[in-house]
Amino acid sequence: MSRYRGPRVRIIRRLGTLPGLTNKTPQLKSSSINQSISNKKISQYRIRLEEKQKLRFHYGITERQLLNYVRIARKAKGSTGEVLLQLLEMRLDNVTFRLGMAPTIPGARQLVNHRHILVNDCIVDIPSYRCKPQDFITIKNQRKSETIISKNIEFYQKSKIPNHLTYSSLEKKGLVNQILDRESIGLKINELLVVEYYSRQA
């Protein structure tokens, strides 16, 4: 399944707020929500499916990519669900987004693809690159790159940067301090339901 490129508002109306996908938060009428809940008996499969879809759309990854991350998480030590979230959060496109360098993860992915982002002073144009503690993220030393990202930071770095990251406005440098903990995840998600969804596939 390819990466979703359709209307983003339609997705968040169905799944709820997904800050990685879009910064829009459409309001739903409570009467329509109550009516839809009363008219449908939501199955456990659907609940697990929707949690999986939240994860996929928020991080902007394909079905195959998400399944691969689940398989990696299963082989790692610790809680599979928590490791899965850590793997997704440490992607370069997501780290760029969480530092406030882009308004959304798709926007951050575009910056990475267009070679605006450096990791440890080396250009990295792979959005799925897995960042590690002590990696530092900087902007390519070109006026176009600096202009784009400076504008993004001015408008989108309003929310608090998570504890596992820091950003120096003076040096225009982001730093990965550590692997993030569960409380720093920027998405309302029940990752255990995602693991259950893939229990027969991974």
From Swiss-Prot:
This is Small ribosomal subunit protein uS4c. The keyword Plastid applies. It comes from Hypnum cupressiforme (Cypress-leaved plait-moss). GO terms for biological process: ribosomal small subunit biogenesis; translation. Pfam families: Ribosomal_S4, S4. Part of the 30S ribosomal subunit. Contacts protein S5. The interaction surface between S4 and S5 is involved in control of translational fidelity. One of its GO terms (cellular component) is chloroplast. InterPro entries: Ribosomal_uS4, Ribosomal_uS4_bac-type, Ribosomal_uS4_N, S4_RNA-bd, S4_RNA-bd_sf. It is found in: Plastid, Chloroplast. Belongs to the universal ribosomal protein uS4 family. Keywords: Chloroplast, Plastid, Ribonucleoprotein, Ribosomal protein, RNA-binding, rRNA-binding. Transmembrane segments: none annotated. Residues 90-153 form the S4 RNA-binding domain.
